Regions:
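An N-terminal assembly and electron-transfer interface module characteristic of large anaerobic redox
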Residues: 1-213
Length: 213
């Protein structure tokens, strides 16, 4: 991601911007999405940092990478850019907010149990299962084939989905040991959460038998 970002973004841009744009362009270059049926969306705050300039940087990167047909949507209340053909409806914004909250829940559950798991890899496996279920429920208005196979319920509206995630992680077999030292990860928001950007600092913390928070 960093190498792709440096290739398509001038290196006077900040590190988080290079990382994010590299990720987005990489996803297209690797063939994970059809460039003729894909749009990229990014927030635009109206401030002076990358949060306003992402729009132009991403558009230029896509053109330079050979994908000028991919539209870039600026999600903003400032009205700096026009987004013809796109309308942020209340229903869409509601789904976006749900995705943000559930993503935070999944991360917190994973970090809380992974240092104590009985079977190595079991927490990551459970996380990936619920990540798939969440994606399906958001795309199909609460319905999930994976959830049907995993917990016997094919329909999970928002509140039950939350409860099922917590219940599932609570049931994961853990070692009967005292809670380990907790280490807080702080700093620039993107670098704090993106493993490649922070050199997998959470893995380093957990490798020293500590719990990342």
């Amino acid at each position: 991601d960093v190498e792709t970002g440096l290739k398509y973004v001038n290196n006077d841009a900040c590190y988080p911007a290079i990382m994010v744009i590299g990720q987005l362009v990489d996803a297209i270059l690797e063939g994970r999405y059809d460039p003729d049926h894909t749009a990229l969306a990014i927030t635009q705050t109206g401030g002076m940092c990358r949060a306003t300039n992402y729009f132009g940087l991403i558009r230029k990167a896509l053109v330079d990478a050979g994908y000028p047909q991919i539209p870039v949507i600026a999600i903003s209340t400032q009205g700096i850019e026009d987004n013809p053909g796109f309308k942020a409806t209340p229903a869409l914004l509601h789904r976006v907010i749900k995705a943000l909250i559930i993503g935070d829940l999944l991360m917190k559950c994973l970090y809380r149990v992974r240092p104590y798991e009985v079977t190595p890899g079991s927490a990551n496996k459970l996380y990936k299962t619920w990540d798939t279920i969440v994606r399906e429920t958001l795309e199909h208005h609460g319905h999930s084939k994976t959830a049907k196979r995993f917990i016997g319920k094919g329909y999970l509206p928002y509140p039950p989905l939350f409860r099922q995630i917590v219940t599932s992680f609570d049931a994961l077999p853990l070692r009967n040991i005292p809670r380990t030292l907790r280490v807080g990860v702080v700093g620039e928001i993107l670098v704090s959460y993106q493993p490649d950007a922070n050199n997998h600092v959470v893995d380093v913390i957990e490798s020293h038998d500590c719990e990342a928070v």
